[in-house]
């Protein structure tokens, strides 16, 4: 997935609005994913999946950090997330469709917290970005 210059600007603009809320949004994204797509819980059998659990917050922080890292290296997402791609493909063996679920839930969280920022153009750019992140995280499955 190739991001245009406008896409990159839009994605960076959204993440500048997210700012210090990235960890909170990461946890909220996971909570939404676990509820909307309960099959994703199978990768977290050892987690307390209740609302506001410390484990969801901690993993949400990791998700947020990875997304921020991808934004900070938007011209080399594959390089920025290479180790994470290895982890998910070789050790965790996460079903690739789960990255699509995560991306969708992240878009919902952004829409809830920043409705004015999520214009149709920004929505499309953010969706392309999340697809690019998902593609990187599943690239080493082959």
From Swiss-Prot:
Alphabetically ordered keywords of this record: Heme, Iron, Metal-binding, Oxygen transport, Transport
GO cellular component: blood microparticle; haptoglobin-hemoglobin complex; hemoglobin complex
Molecular functions (GO terms): haptoglobin binding; heme binding; iron ion binding; organic acid binding; oxygen binding; oxygen carrier activity; peroxidase activity
Annotated signal peptide: none
Tissue expression from the record: Red blood cells.
Entries under InterPro entries matching the protein: Globin, Globin-like_sf, Globin/Proto, Hemoglobin_a-typ, Hemoglobin_oxygen_transport, Hemoglobin_pi
Binding sites annotated in the UniProt record for O2: 59
Positions annotated to bind heme b: 88
Keyword Methyltransferase among UniProt keywords: no
Pfam families, sorted: Globin (PF00042)
GO biological process assignments: hydrogen peroxide catabolic process
Residue span(s) of domain Globin: 2-142
Keyword NADP applies: no
Subunit details: Heterotetramer of two alpha chains and two beta chains.
Family: Belongs to the globin family.
Function as written in the Swiss-Prot or TrEMBL entry: Involved in oxygen transport from the lung to the various peripheral tissues.
Protein name from the UniProt record: Hemoglobin subunit alpha-A
Taxonomic source organism: Anas platyrhynchos platyrhynchos
Top-level taxonomy: Eukaryota, Metazoa, Chordata, Craniata, Vertebrata
């Amino acid at each position: 997935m190739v991001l245009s210059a406008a896409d990159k600007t839009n994605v960076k603009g959204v993440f500048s609005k997210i700012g210090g809320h990235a960890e909170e949004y990461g946890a909220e994204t996971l909570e939404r994913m676990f509820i909307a797509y309960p099959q994703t819980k199978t990768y977290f059998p050892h987690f307390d999946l209740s609302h506001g659990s410390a484990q969801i917050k901690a993993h949400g922080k990791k998700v947020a950090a990875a997304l921020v890292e991808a934004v900070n290296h938007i011209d080399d997402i594959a390089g920025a997330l290479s180790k994470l791609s290895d982890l998910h493909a070789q050790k965790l063996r996460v079903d690739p469709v789960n990255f699509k679920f995560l991306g969708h839930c992240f878009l919902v969280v952004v829409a809830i917290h920043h409705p004015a920022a999520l214009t149709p153009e920004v929505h499309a750019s953010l969706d392309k970005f999340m697809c690019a992140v998902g593609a990187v995280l599943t690239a080493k499955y082959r």
